[in-house]
Amino acid sequence: MNISTIRKDFMIVNMGPHHPSMHGVLRLIVTLDGEDVIDCEPILGYLHRGMEKIAENRTIIQYLPYVTRWDYLATMFTEAITVNGPEQLGNIQVPKRASYIRVIMLELSRIASHLLWLGPFMADIGAQTPFFYIFREREFIYDLFEAATGMRMMHNFFRIGGVATDLPYGWVDKCSDFCDYFLTSIAEYQKLITRNPIFLERVEGVGVVDVKEVINWGLSGPMLRASGIQWDLRKVDNYECYEEFHWEVQWQKEGDSLARYLVRIGEMVESIKIIQQALEGLPGGPYENLEIRCFDREKEPEWNEFEYRFISKKSSPSFELPKQELYVRIEAPKGELGIFIIGDQNGFPWRWKIHPPGFINLQILPQLVKRMKLADIMTILGSIDIIMGEVDR
């Protein structure tokens, strides 16, 4: 008696790459057995632009406009890490007012980044309404950025020793009004999303990462804190002036997509607390360290006194990076953003190595999606929160 055998062939599906304004140029080669994911292979590099090598052929002030193209949804953080390294190498002091302004801008940028994560994440799992709501609040933040820096995105606002310009008249009151308004908006999001049974069905227990895996994979940011580890570089390293503000590290212990959502929602509330304290205690004084403009006193000024008086041309501060090695890091919206710098008594860094949080966090994706359903891939990928400009560099 012949027993007929059924031959099963796996299906290989290409997901992406998409346009950078959507999910980014990430390609996933997914092997399926029906609806079950057997394997997933991420293909990177479509947005690689050689950002590290560009840094090694530019002075820091020349390189600043490039760094806003890493994570183009949280550009204040890439600017901050770019100036923090040379400031520590050169032992340059940042005035207290400039440090407060930096903190305000960083936390506004964190909120904007989390908002633009929340909207597409909800759209991916079938909820279209929050996608339109988040742009309403994001526009207010971008209006504040435009008033202070002149640009809605790609701000080029941070400088070695301070910031490019002081806050304009009336900006503090406008920002304070936004903080009061945004707290009600977060309550609206929580009412609309957090207890929604369809939302909970899609995210609860999906993409679970335990504490041991988080540490072994080197994950950071909301991915780390959603698995029960209270680690936030704003508390650990106390860079800028975060130690002067009262706020709590947001964390969950479940480690699933819902926990990562709750961490980011809580972080937006804590960012508002930090901004309100910074606005209330904003000190007077200079917004930049004027001493860094006097590194080279021997050269004749490029413009005469008359032109300086009426055109207000600022010199471009550049100095030799001492022969040292340094690793600096900050808590970006997606995790630990770091720079490893090697100076060589030159205006250009000898080595500029970027530690991007998105690239590190993305490594665990194949493990998380195995034995899950095809529809869960977008839920898990969205909960990681990546920007391909930062991943590919």
UniProtKB/Swiss-Prot annotation:
It comes from Phaseolus vulgaris. GO terms for biological process: photosynthesis, light reaction. NDH is composed of at least 16 different subunits, 5 of which are encoded in the nucleus. It is a peripheral membrane protein. GO terms for molecular function: NAD binding; oxidoreductase activity, acting on NAD(P)H, quinone or similar compound as acceptor; quinone binding. PROSITE patterns: COMPLEX1_49K. It holds the Pfam family Complex1_49kDa. Keywords: Chloroplast, Membrane, NAD, NADP, Plastid, Plastoquinone, Quinone, Thylakoid, Translocase, Transport. It is found in: Plastid, Chloroplast thylakoid membrane. Its EC number is 7.1.1.-. This is NAD(P)H-quinone oxidoreductase subunit H, chloroplastic. NDH shuttles electrons from NAD(P)H:plastoquinone, via FMN and iron-sulfur (Fe-S) centers, to quinones in the photosynthetic chain and possibly in a chloroplast respiratory chain. The immediate electron acceptor for the enzyme in this species is believed to be plastoquinone. Couples the redox reaction to proton translocation, and thus conserves the redox energy in a proton gradient. The gene is ndhH. GO terms for cellular component: chloroplast thylakoid membrane. Belongs to the complex I 49 kDa subunit family. It catalyses: a plastoquinone + NADH + (n+1) H(+)(in) = a plastoquinol + NAD(+) + n H(+)(out); a plastoquinone + NADPH + (n+1) H(+)(in) = a plastoquinol + NADP(+) + n H(+)(out).
